[in-house]
Amino acid sequence: MKLHLLGCNGWIPGKNETSCFLLEHKNNLIMLDLGTGVSNLDKFKGVLDKYDELTVILSHYHLDHIIGIIYLLPYLKDKKLTIYGPGKPYYALTTEEYLSNLLRTEFFSRPLLKIAKNVICRDYTTDGFQIDDIQIIIKQQIHSSPSFQINIDNKLIYATDTAFQSELFSDISKNTVLLHECWDAVNSGNVKHSSLPLIMKGLQNYDFQKVILIHLNPEWTLAEQRIIHNQIIGTKYCLGKDGKTFDF
């Protein structure tokens, strides 16, 4: 599996764009979330050129995770696009309805079903689903709107926009890479997002390959950045940075 980091910030762009990650796995190209990080696809044209289809899996529908859908247009003119997202019973509308509303003609000149040569939208549930022989495990998280952990073949677990929930990591193994949001440098009692101390404490009894901290807070002060650096130096934790690639 190859993992390309396209958008490691939460909320708004800064040093990084917002949530977007590109995976190459078992001859499939998978994108996690559609934040402004989609704009970094220009740096990965060589990756895109190897595939005829892009599969997107959305964790939820907050704008910093879907607004980049409009940036897909120049890259997918000759490709198939399949988008999985949470629909009913977690949300009132389907994935296709939410994204179609975002791309109404008042807001963008190209409708959803014209973003690529062929566009298919599918709703997922916590029953999970498969992409060819790739197993996708879905678990609901705690957030202001329903968000979902995405586990890909137990090699990569994507957990963003969530309070830390250690019970959701029972599938983790020594070969698992974890993409986990890190919004707070210290534990402030935030019930919608995760702090680094709670993440590190909650995962201390789990064996894993690496934790890449993502959905980073653009408002961190220099003091908070130093706190984080001092906590993760010499550990299996690292801060996500746009443009980086991991091969595992």
Where do the PLM segments sit?
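Binuclear metal-dependent hydrolase catalytic cores
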Residues: 1-158, 226-248
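Short glycine-/small-residue-rich Rossmann-like dinucleotide-binding loops
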Residues: 35-36, 161, 183-184
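Cap/insert and terminal regions of metallo-dependent hydrolase folds
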Residues: 164-246
